[in-house]
Amino acid sequence: MKFNTALLHGDFQGEPNTGATTTPVYQSSAFAHESAEKLEKIFHNQAPGYSYTRISNPTVDAFEKRVTALEGGVASVACASGMAALYNAFCNILRSGDEIVSSASLYGGSIDLFRDLEAFGITTHYVENNDLAAFEAKTNEHTRLYFAETIGNPRLDVTDITALANLAHEHQIPLIIDNTVATAFLVKPLSLGADIVMNSSSKYINGHSNSISGIITDSGRFKWDVEKYPGMADFKKFGPFAYTAKLRNGLFRNTGACLSPQNAFYNCIGLETLGIRMERICDNAAELARFFVREYPDVTVNYPGLESSPWHEIAKKQFRDRFGGILTIRTGSKKRAFEIINALKLPLIISNIGDTKTLVIHPESTLNVHSTPEEKRDAGVFDDLIRISVGIEDVEDLIEDFRQAMDQSKPEKSEE
């Protein structure tokens, strides 16, 4: 099946007891069973079933299964937020003394999380420009995973997933990819060799800014060396499900990172239109980027779909004929960036991406407010930068709105 058909029918089960065509919301904290023996078996992973929503829930389970099918994995674990998913994805296999080698081009919240992990003895080494030689140079006997975003947010660099996965596997370590900005519509990282993929499903998967959530999907292919990953020893018996079995029965359960059934319900609805939304969003973003290049040579436009992008070729090779829904412009000064943002009538000034509506933000003063100057530079964050998450509006209206906002502003030199 093709992408949109698979979204609608690939893992659709409906509700067998009533014939409902939409996944019901099982708004229950716990689940009753006919005998103590049955509940004992569920707790010992000897029988399928639900016991407590902090561990699993039928509505959440339906969302997890649909994302698993979408990403081409063996199992998924849905979390209360994208940050909860990121933390759980990492700390499911890490312990004090372990090290991460990561792309330096990351969402500001991810950088903040890595800083918090230092208190637990987990160190992160950053690599500029996703340079494979630098990944290799920073890898040592303590390295336990590689991490990168498919499309860096907001730098918009594109990771060569296959090349990075091959390097990770040479060192017998897994590659975890954050696919939030690209989504499975553009690329399925597990099919290119990544071992684990996570998404902040609050963004494009949900698509309507009505819930916070994240999800982790495992390929089931990585062979866990219990000397490197001693916590996996008791879960090797689960075969390809070892990683998610450990996660659900350990860190995820014990940190209370569960997704609410209501938010899972919203995500199931949003997921069905991911393909048609992304088609429109990507096309609008490309047209808006070309508009800036054509009419405003005094601003620097960054979008992977432009031939001027350093990552255009790898994006063409890796993506499905489109290049994502985010672009950035450098305006010359923070003052001008604020003037443009404040003059816009259609886009919302919001710290989110992936909505049906166009969203704008000044990352340097918001999302990366806790980042050091070096971290901001490596992430492509400057004081004159505007990030634009393009929506599904008629692109002609967006262009006219940006034109009037740009024309009201005065070019100035940026401070770097």
Please give the residue ranges for each predicted region.
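Short loop segments at secondary-structure junctions
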Residues: 30, 218-222, 331-335
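Positively charged, small/polar-rich N-terminal and surface patches that mediate targeting and assembly
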Residues: 2-4, 10, 58, 354-355, ...
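PLP-dependent enzyme catalytic core of the Aspartate aminotransferase-like
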Residues: 115-116, 124-125, 141-144, 335, ...
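Conserved N-terminal alpha-helix of the aminotransferase class I/II PLP-enzyme fold
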Residues: 30, 35-87, 109-116
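Short, well-ordered beta-strand elements within core beta-sheets of diverse protein domains
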Residues: 266-276, 324-332, 387-391
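N-terminal glycine-rich, Lys/His-bearing helix-loop that initiates the first secondary-structure elements
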Residues: 1-47, 415-416
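Conserved small-domain helix->loop->beta segment predominantly found in fold-type I
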Residues: 255-257, 278-351, 355, 371-377, ...
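Conserved PLP-enzyme active-site core in the AAT-like
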Residues: 7-16, 76-296
